[in-house]
């Protein structure tokens, strides 16, 4: 295929783990016809149709199998890479930029957080899922760190799939984990649609790129979305917490200032003995620079944080931080999804930081409901 795949189609490509892509054959040439191309396994399972490609002319094609968007610089500047699968795709930054015209501003922000974060959301087809489960025991022999290192036989760094914990009963908590099955229960040990990987984009790159394209068509919308990305998140639940706590009150957020995401905190000697490490990372750290007080928000989801061993590590980390005088709030998906519980958390944070608490007006509460629906959405639906 000679055309450059972009926008939502490219977004789905970049969400697909390399070990999944390696299971598929190359795409047929578009000279064989777009109908044949659209029936290839990788398109059916991952890219979906219509395939969105860039066009440097005024011609706009819209069909069941293909759609083009006008983009003058697509074939004059280096904006794409060769996938090795028989087609080229826009790089992650230009993928986000070309998505601007076809997704909501909130979905664009979520996509930016995902590309800048340590996670991706992808649900394999049933056949691919079986193939992945067969290699699950082999993957479990490696640590998270080793999965981020290339060996001599690998072209790309494999991603680490997050598996569900045992005894998960409540389907509501699955909302932040993309509702992996339709029954409302995630099977014990079953692979979820959450994957861990290195960030595709550095957050500084995103902000520089946004400033560069601000004057172009759709550039202002892209720039405004990029301004809302304020840190490097490790899960969709963290993104939801960040946006609900940092967004302006008129937009439904709590409008806390001085928020830091996955902030590094050196531990005291006694805290090191508890945690067994020299430093800890707080999911969301909110600071009052005047009083020099800080609270730490720890986002907790069973599937997000994986195994019981990881949960035990979270507990020791929280205890270590509390021993140093930090107020640590353990927040779940259900708490974020309930106005009264979230409001109580915001009230408590204000008290700890000696900030003035202001109840939300009815209009602000309506805006919060809309924001909550957007950020606690099914992440698999972004870009569809």
Please annotate each region the language model reported.
Residues 1-217, 360-361, 369-384:
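Short gly/ser-rich loop at a beta-strand->alpha-helix junction or flexible surface loop bordering the NTP-binding
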């Amino acid at each position: 295929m000679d055309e450059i795949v972009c926008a939502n189609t490219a977004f789905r490509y970049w969400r697909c783990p390399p070990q999944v892509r390696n299971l598929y054959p190359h795409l047929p040439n578009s000279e064989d016809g777009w109908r044949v191309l659209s029936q290839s396994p990788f398109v059916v399972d991952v890219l979906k149709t219509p395939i969105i490609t860039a066009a440097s002319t005024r011609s706009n094609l819209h069909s069941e199998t293909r759609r083009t968007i006008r983009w003058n610089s697509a074939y004059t500047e280096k904006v794409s890479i060769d996938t090795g699968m028989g087609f080229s795709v826009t790089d992650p930054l230009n993928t986000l930029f070309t998505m601007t015209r076809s997704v909501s501003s909130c979905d664009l922000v979520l996509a930016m957080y995902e590309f800048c974060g340590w996670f991706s959301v992808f649900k394999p087809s049933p056949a691919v899922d079986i193939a992945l489960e067969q290699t699950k025991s082999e993957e479990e022999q490696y640590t998270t760190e080793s999965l981020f290192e290339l060996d001599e036989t690998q072209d790309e760094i494999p991603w680490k799939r997050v598996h569900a914990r045992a005894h998960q009963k409540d389907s509501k908590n699955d909302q932040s984990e993309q509702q992996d099955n339709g029954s409302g229960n995630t099977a014990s040990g079953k692979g979820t649609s959450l994957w861990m990987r290195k960030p595709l984009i550095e957050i500084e790159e995103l902000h520089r790129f946004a400033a560069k394209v601000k004057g172009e068509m759709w550039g202002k919308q892209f720039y405004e979305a990029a301004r809302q990305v304020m840190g490097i998140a490790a899960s969709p639940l963290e993104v939801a917490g960040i946006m609900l706590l940092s967004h302006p009150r008129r937009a439904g957020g709590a409008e806390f200032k001085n928020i830091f995401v996955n902030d590094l905190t050196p531990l005291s000697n006694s805290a090191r003995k508890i945690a067994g490490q020299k430093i800890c990372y707080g999911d969301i750290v909110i600071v009052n620079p005047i009083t020099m007080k800080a609270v730490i928000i720890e986002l907790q989801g069973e599937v997000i944080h994986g195994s019981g061993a990881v949960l035990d590590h979270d507990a020791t980390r929280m205890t270590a931080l509390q021993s140093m005088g930090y107020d640590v709030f353990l927040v779940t998906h259900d708490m974020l999804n309930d106005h009264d519980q979230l409001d109580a958390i915001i009230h408590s944070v204000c008290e700890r930081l000696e900030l003035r608490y202001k109840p939300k007006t009815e209009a602000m509460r309506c805006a919060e409901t809309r924001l909550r629906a957007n950020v606690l959405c099914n992440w698999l639906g972004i870009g569809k």
